[in-house]
Regions:
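Predominantly flavin-linked oxidoreductase catalytic cores and closely associated redox partners
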Residues: 78-197, 226, 243
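FAD/FMN-dependent oxidoreductases across multiple families
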Residues: 168, 177-287
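Active-site catalytic microenvironments for nucleophilic, acid-base chemistry
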Residues: 9-10, 90-93, 245, 249-253
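Short, glycine/charge-rich beta-strand/loop segments that flank catalytic centers
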Residues: 19-30, 102-107, 204-206
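Conserved N-terminal helical subregion
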Residues: 35-105, 118
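N-terminal FAD cofactor-binding segment of flavoenzymes
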Residues: 1-58
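Long, low-complexity C-terminal extensions of enzymes
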Residues: 248, 252-332
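Short, charged/polar micro-motifs that form catalytic or ligand-binding hotspots
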Residues: 20-25, 70-78, 154, 177, ...
Length: 332
C-alpha cells in the first residue's frame, strides 16, 4: 500500500499495469509459519484508517470487476524489470537529466543519492532470528487457482520459505533460504519438483543496516541503506519512506542541509528500521517450529526475543492481533 503514494504522484492512470504484467494484491497468505500446518492471512488494511470488518469483506471478495477503493486496501504485483524503462521515460518527461557514468562516492563536491544496493551496504547484522542469505527465483505458467488469486502466498519450509506471486501472464515463484543448510543445487531441485521451474536467478543478499545513512554529501536509499529480508517487501517501503522523510525534513529545515539535519534524519531512519526488524523477527521468534536444524538454530534466540518483545507504536491493534492469533505464542 505504501507504493500507492509513489504511483499516484508519478502516473496519471494505471496504464502501466498491462505494460508490466501487473496484478492487484489485496492480502498476503502465510502458510507453515507457526507450525507446519498453520495458515494466517494479512489483509492490506490499517485500523488507523479503515473499518476493519468492511475492509475484510471487500478484499476477500475482490476480483477484476470489484477492486476496493480504500487507499490502504491494495498493492500491486509486477515485473519490476519492465517498470524500469517506464520510470526512466517518466523522469525524462519531468525534466530529470539522466547521467550514466561511474561515480566516486568519496567526491564531496556534490550531494549524491546512493542507490548501489548491496554494493553500498555494510553496517550492523539485522538479527540472529533472521538467518536467510540467498534467494532463487523464476517464472512458471499459471497453475491451480493462480489466475484468480489476488494475493501473495508464502510457505515456510524446513529451511526458509517459498513464495508465489501471480502476474497477468505467469507466476513468480522462488525460495528464500540459508545457504548453511542447503546447497544451491538442492534448492533448485526442490523448486523444479514443486513448480517445474527450470530457469533460475540466484540472488545472494546481506541482512544488514547502516546506522548512518545520511551525511552532508550522500543519502543511502533502498538496499544500500538496509535490507531486512525479502519477506513482506520491506525494502520497497523503506525506499518510499526514505524519499518522503528526506523531502519533508528539507522543508522543515528550510532546505538547509547541516549537521543537525543529518543527525535527525539518521535518528528517524534508525527508528523506522528497528520497528520493521521487530515485525520481521516476529515471524521467526513467535513460531514454534523446531523440526529441522534451520529452525533449531532460530529457536536458540526465541526466548530472549519473546521476553523483550514490544510492538512498535505505529502498528495497529489489528496487525498485532493477526500476528499473535496466527502464531501460537501469545503476548503476556
Amino acid at each position: 500500500p505504501y507504493m500507492r503514494f509513489f504511483f499516484e504522484k508519478v502516473f496519471d492512470d494505471e496504464s502501466w499495469m498491462d505494460q508490466t504484467n501487473a496484478t492487484y494484491k489485496f492480502y498476503i497468505k502465510h502458510d507453515g509459519w507457526a507450525n507446519e500446518n498453520s495458515s494466517m492471512i494479512f489483509p492490506l488494511c490499517d485500523d488507523r484508517f479503515d473499518d476493519i470488518e468492511e475492509c475484510e469483506r471487500e478484499i476477500f471478495s475482490a476480483d477484476k470487476n470489484n477492486v476496493p477503493e480504500c487507499s490502504s486496501r491494495h498493492a500491486w504485483q509486477m515485473q519490476s524489470v519492465l517498470l524500469q524503462p517506464i520510470l526512466i521515460e517518466k523522469c525524462k518527461e519531468l525534466g530529470v537529466n539522466l547521467i550514466e557514468e561511474n561515480y566516486d562516492f568519496s567526491n564531496t563536491d556534490i550531494f549524491a543519492i546512493d542507490c548501489r544496493g548491496f554494493d553500498g551496504l555494510g553496517g550492523e547484522v539485522i538479527s540472529p532470528l533472521i538467518i536467510n542469505d540467498t534467494a532463487i527465483a523464476g517464472h512458471v505458467n499459471h497453475f491451480k487457482d493462480t489466475e484468480q488469486r489476488y494475493y501473495t502466498r508464502t510457505n515456510a519450509t524446513d529451511n526458509g520459505w517459498f513464495w508465489e506471486i501471480p502476474l497477468q501472464n505467469k507466476v513468480g515463484v522462488g525460495r528464500v533460504y540459508c545457504s548453511k543448510y542447503n546447497t544451491e543445487d538442492e534448492i533448485k531441485k526442490q523448486l523444479n519438483e514443486q513448480y517445474g521451474l527450470d530457469t533460475f536467478l540466484k540472488v545472494p543478499f546481506k541482512t544488514k543496516y547502516k546506522e548512518t545513512v545520511c551525511t552532508m554529501h550522500t543519502l543511502k536509499v533502498g538496499s544500500a541503506a538496509a535490507f531486512i529480508e525479502p519477506l513482506e517487501a520491506t525494502t520497497l517501503l523503506l525506499v518510499v519512506y526514505s524519499c518522503y522523510l528526506f523531502k519533508e525534513m528539507l522543508k522543515s529545515f528550510s532546505f538547509r542541509l547541516d549537521d543537525d539535519f543529518v543527525k535527525h534524519y539518521n535518528l528517524n531512519f534508525k527508528q523506522m528500521i528497528q520497528n520493521h526488524i521487530v515485525f520481521m523477527e516476529s515471524f521467526y521468534g513467535l513460531s514454534d517450529r523446531n523440526d529441522s536444524p534451520y529452525w533449531n538454530e532460530i529457536d536458540k534466540h526465541r526466548k530472549q526475543f519473546r521476553d523483550s518483545h514490544e510492538w512498535p507504536e505505529f502498528y495497529g491493534e489489528y496487525i498485532k492481533k493477526k500476528m499473535y492469533d496466527g502464531l501460537s505464542y501469545n503476548i503476556k
